[in-house]
Amino acid sequence: MGKNKKQRRKTAPAAVKAAPDYKKYIGLFLIPLAFFAVEAFSWVFLRGSSGTKWPLVFGLLWAVMLSAAVLGMPAGAGRIAFGVVYGLAAIYAVVETGYYILFKEMMWLSDFRYASEGSDYFSVLLSYPVHWWLGILALIGLGVAAVWLFPRGKYNWNQTVAAIVLFAVAGNFAYRLPYEQFDQDKDVKYARSDYGRMQSLEAAYENLFNTHRLYQVCGLYQTLWKDIYTHNIYPLTPAYTQAHEAGREEIDAYFAEKDKPQKNEM
């Protein structure tokens, strides 16, 4: 009898260790859900009268890409990366939706420098729809839960390789998908005229003439990426600053040479 009790005591810890780690699986589910929730929250307010669902498709692809990126890192680094990326994306979504509710337009990142001028409109926030505020609270809650339940464990290369493959596949779809939509441009009135071309999806995506039109083509995440990449918005590294300074000196030297009086040979 006593021997059986000892055996049960020895096997109990092993049984506990063998139990599924539900916390890990919940964390794995919450990370892509949180990233997609940012796009879904934006879509509710930014879809406009067209009601296009393309932003949700792109949001799903970007949720896969970003989840693969953070889950492919060691647990500690991945958790920090998730918190930073998700936090910035959520703030971007809140600012863009808030601006759109007020002005029916979206902003480029370069317009954010004038955000301080909007302090006069703070009182208007009280009149914003309740579901906008509830959506913000939901984003905060999802972010906190995902950080808290972020999967922990030993780092292994298989995880990174799988993440790279997943990122590459989703990224390939996100890159090609806008071009699949351009067939709709043939239905635009006066499609061959300059006016028609400016109304086309291709012009919205390639020329970036309007932030909201770009969003309707490719969603919030890809709009943000296109804005950063096309408008060269990135940290001013020492190399960039040095190259910029060299270019400025070259231009100054050119105009200084032009200002010198030229000898008339006649």
Residue ranges and their predicted role:
Residues 237-243:
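Non-catalytic propeptide/linker segments at domain boundaries
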Residues 245-254:
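Charged, flexible boundary elements
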Residues 3-5, 22, 260:
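Short linear motifs in intrinsically disordered/low-complexity regions
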Residues 10-11, 15-233:
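Transmembrane and membrane-interface helices of multi-pass
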Residues 253-256, 260-266:
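Membrane-embedded segments
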Residues 1-11:
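N-terminal targeting leaders characterized by basic, low-complexity, disordered sequences
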